[in-house]
């Protein structure tokens, strides 16, 4: 038996895959920031959860960033699957070897192709602009932040990607966004 909402979400993925993934990413980016803001505030017995202040503009910025991120990752997972299928044709290995090779190649491609492109051309520029950094300073921001970001990304995402690259392609954005939270 499917979880409540799973069938509807699967139908939306089938009918409007990019829109569904983009809106999902936006929602979960916003939710992640909401959780972060709640965890940043001091907790005391006298402070009820409903009395905590939330920076709605910040949540909105995260959600806007998530819209584009959903599109980027939707496109990436399709490209990565195409490259993986071309480089490791189905049936060329036993089923376990096929799964292992596909997962490893997906992770390598993501770390060395997608992440440098995504961080340099989307995430860092968008976050920088949202933070008020002038457009002319963005190349310096990328040069300054990209190397450490790629190293930290590999540390966090390599284990998660072992699972993500074994999820059906339609569901990978949701799986990835869930790890983001």
Say what each PLM segment does.
Residues 43-44, 138:
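Short, intrinsically disordered/low-complexity patches at protein termini
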Residues 46-47, 86-94:
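Transmembrane helix-loop-helix
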Residues 10-15, 51-56, 92-99, 139:
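Helix-boundary and loop/linker segments of multi-pass membrane transporters
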């Amino acid at each position: 038996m499917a979880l409540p909402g799973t069938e509807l979400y699967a139908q939306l993925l089938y009918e409007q895959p990019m829109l569904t993934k983009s809106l999902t990413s936006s929602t979960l980016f916003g939710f992640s920031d909401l959780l972060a803001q709640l965890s940043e505030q001091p907790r005391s017995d006298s402070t009820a959860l409903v009395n905590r202040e939330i920076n709605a503009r910040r949540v909105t910025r995260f959600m806007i960033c998530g819209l584009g991120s959903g599109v980027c990752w939707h496109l990436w997972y399709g490209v990565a699957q195409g490259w993986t299928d071309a480089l490791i044709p189905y049936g060329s290995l036993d089923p376990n070897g096929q799964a292992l090779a596909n997962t490893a190649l997906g992770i390598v491609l993501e770390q060395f192709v997608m992440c440098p492109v995504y961080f340099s051309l989307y995430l860092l520029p968008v976050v920088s602009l949202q933070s008020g950094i002038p457009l002319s300073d963005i190349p310096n921001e990328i040069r300054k932040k990209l190397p450490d970001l790629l190293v930290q990304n590999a540390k966090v995402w390599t284990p998660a990607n072992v699972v993500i690259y074994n999820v059906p392609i339609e569901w990978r954005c949701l799986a990835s966004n869930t790890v983001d939270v």
